[in-house]
């Protein structure tokens, strides 16, 4: 593969990651990677808030 094309692809992937991370911080949501980690937790209803995993977010009091 063309080295310039590889570099362009790498830059695009890095930009996508940075944009997703910044957008998540601005909106108060968690990045996709942390969302996946939270969903793998073994609790009733895992979720991600303020960049931390929590259990029981779906429960209503």
Swiss-Prot record:
Keywords: Disulfide bond, Secreted, Signal, Toxin. It is found in: Secreted. Contains 4 disulfide bonds. GO terms for cellular component: extracellular region. Residues 1-24 form the signal peptide. Coiled coil: none annotated. Expressed by the venom gland. GO terms for molecular function: toxin activity. Its main location: secreted. Belongs to the scoloptoxin-14 family. This is U-scoloptoxin(14)-Sm1a. It comes from Scolopendra morsitans. The lineage of its organism: Eukaryota, Metazoa, Ecdysozoa, Arthropoda, Myriapoda.
